[in-house]
Amino acid sequence: MIPSATYRIQFRNGMTFDRAAALAPYLKDLGISHLYASPIFTATSGSTHGYDITDPNEIDPAIGGREGFDRMVKALRNAQIGLILDIVPNHMATSLENRWWRDVIEQGKNSAWAHYFDIDWTRPVTLPFLGDTFEIGRASCRERV
């Protein structure tokens, strides 16, 4: 079915699969043909958007996991509403919560996951992490110079 009217759901921040499932009858009454879902894969702890994936093989337990996803899909089918997923395959978090990234940091180019990341191995990998907000980090750097 070709989408004719989509409704976007931003999962996280209290929006779960079960809450989206409960909206299905209302969306049907509005004439919505498809639910357009924000990323659903496991993201960094506290992610507000889901574009910082840490496990592309797991539906995020924080928004209902696989079981919640299946309940939502069933509710959408019952309402004859399609589902469009924003899968963001090019958005993997550079966080140690991401086991692929953590392995690359630990094993370097010998990591089984090294080819998944665009890393120039001809020079040392630089990871510029601030220990605080940008403003505080910048002020701290000025104090040391």
Feature map (PLM): residue ranges:
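Catalytic cores of glycan-processing enzymes that make or break glycosidic bonds
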Residues: 1-144
